[in-house]
Amino acid sequence: MKAISPVRSMSSCYQAVCCLSEQSLSIARGSSHKGPGMDEPMGLLYDMNGCYSKLKELVPGIPQGSKLSQVEILQHVIDYIFDLQIVLGEDQQQSSILSLQKSDFSELATQGDTSVCH
């Protein structure tokens, strides 16, 4: 699975991350913002279902409108994170190669060897 992301505005991604962070904090604190009369386990279940729905929206490659199990959603998320790590690793490796080439060139230029220029 290739990490190809549809174009999203930065504000919508930021809002989604904030939403997930707020939900995670409310779960960790044990507060249920769904309603005062709601049982704790049911509140957590609704929060988790909301988180899975948000993951389906945010992770590219998950078919929208299809019924996936929670395990399948998590597998798509894991695959996407792995793809991102590979892409970031390749970018980092390319930038380090370019910086090495630049430093090698600057060493040659400071040695005063004019035969390189001819």
UniProtKB/Swiss-Prot annotation:
Its main location: nucleus. It holds the Pfam family HLH. SUPFAM superfamilies: HLH, helix-loop-helix DNA-binding domain. Residues 32-84 form the bHLH domain. GO terms for biological process: circadian regulation of gene expression; negative regulation of DNA binding; negative regulation of DNA-templated transcription; negative regulation of transcription by RNA polymerase II; neural crest formation; neuron differentiation; regulation of cell cycle. Gene3D superfamilies: Helix-loop-helix DNA-binding domain. It is found in: Nucleus. It comes from the Eukaryota. GO terms for cellular component: cytoplasm; nucleus. Induction: By bmp and notch signaling, and in response to signaling events of early neural crest induction. Repressed by hes4/hairy2 in a DNA-binding dependent manner through repression of bmp4 transcription, but up-regulated by hes4/hairy2 acting via delta1 activation. By myc. At gastrula stage, expressed in all three germ layers, but becomes localized to discrete domains of the developing nervous system during neurulation, including the anterior neural plate, cement gland, eye anlagen, otic placode and both cranial and trunk premigratory and early migratory neural crest cells. Also expressed in the most dorsal and ventral portions of the myotome, the developing heart and anterior blood islets, and in the tail fin mesenchyme. GO terms for molecular function: bHLH transcription factor binding; protein dimerization activity; transcription corepressor activity. InterPro entries: bHLH_dom (IPR011598), DNA-bd_prot-inh (IPR026052), HLH_DNA-bd_sf (IPR036638). Keywords: Biological rhythms, Developmental protein, Nucleus, Repressor, Transcription, Transcription regulation. CDD domains: bHLH_dnHLH_ID3. Homodimer. Heterodimer with other HLH proteins. Interacts (via HLH domain) with the bHLH protein hes4/hairy2 (via Orange domain). Interacts with stat3. Transcriptional regulator (lacking a basic DNA binding domain) which negatively regulates the basic helix-loop-helix (bHLH) transcription factors by forming heterodimers and inhibiting their DNA binding and transcriptional activity. Influences cell fate decisions in the embryo by sequestering and blocking the activity of the bHLH transcription factors that control these decisions. Inhibits the binding of myogenic bHLH-containing complexes to E-box DNA, thereby preventing activation of muscle-specific target genes. Also inhibits the activity of neurogenic factor neurod1/neuroD. This is DNA-binding protein inhibitor ID-3-A.
